[in-house]
């Protein structure tokens, strides 16, 4: 369910940062800075270190992303 042109990749939360930002290590080894999507904030979905997540990356800036799903 990625936006038009967005890239969806899986990763693992490495560390929480201020302002609902997270450092995420992708499965390919890269580390990106990601924030929580609006729907996840609305539904109070908590994200903890070591959680597996799906991150949506923009093709314009591959170092930043949006967390769109947390695996149970």
Swiss-Prot record:
GO cellular component: cytosol
A Pfam match: eIF-1a
Main location: cytoplasm
Keywords: Cytoplasm, Initiation factor, Protein biosynthesis, RNA-binding, rRNA-binding
NCBIfam families: infA
Cited HAMAP family: IF_1
Purpose of the protein: One of the essential components for the initiation of protein synthesis. Stabilizes the binding of IF-2 and IF-3 on the 30S subunit to which N-formylmethionyl-tRNA(fMet) subsequently binds. Helps modulate mRNA selection, yielding the 30S pre-initiation complex (PIC). Upon addition of the 50S ribosomal subunit IF-1, IF-2 and IF-3 are released leaving the mature 70S translation initiation complex.
Protein name: Translation initiation factor IF-1
Gene that specifies this protein: infA
